[in-house]
């Protein structure tokens, strides 16, 4: 029977494979020599350590505390490997299902005939979206000529998020090229925007050469409302919930997965497009 400690903390037993490398437990004085033959057979160092941990479970917490950074690193690596494995399996299924998205009236970053298209569904007030923007910009640099990107605002229901989406969408409609500058400024200054509201939008727009009255009028126009509604319904049809979300050709990527997984997604898309 397991000690009460393990019955009340069942997850601790699962940590043994990670803990054993850290444990340095000397055999008791005058005890049997490890590796000697006994009635139960040869006793290994690993078995001795495991037995010691079971007999003194408080050592488990001591080992965790003393090696907390290393244990955390191992856990993070394991989580990353598990997530990568799951994504690779998902992507093999994704490429078999064509995703239908509207792109003909959108502004792009990257070469027009790039073999890989990334559609970013994002929110200007989402911290994970801001984090992912940095990775996306690096991807565009690394895969210059092979990757293009467009942006679709997917705001939350709160007015701060919705207003940012309306103004950014209007900026693209008024000037598809300058719209990217507004997009960048809004992401880079999102915290300031959340503090200042429309005043930040006005300063940003005017610094980029927009007529703010025209921009504000466009932001509240039926054209902007229709585009945002369309993109929201498109996201629903794709099974997208939450931001950020990315469609890389037909591969679905949810969340700010980090540079390495983004690169793997692009490489996978290139391979299936025959352009690697």
Question: What do these predicted regions represent?
Answer:
Residues 41-53, 59, 70-75, 203-276:
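C-terminal cap of thioredoxin/glutaredoxin-like
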Residues 119, 130-206, 236-241:
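Structural alpha/beta surface segment adjacent to cysteine/selenocysteine redox centers
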Residues 123-132, 244-247:
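The canonical Cys-X-X-Cys-His
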Residues 17, 28-96:
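N-terminal targeting signals for export/organelle localization
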Residues 100-116, 141:
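A short beta-strand-turn-helix
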Residues 13-27:
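Bacterial N-terminal signal peptides
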Residues 1-8:
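N-terminal secretory signal peptides that target proteins for export/translocation
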Residues 38, 42, 46, 53, ...:
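Solvent-exposed, acidic/flexible segments
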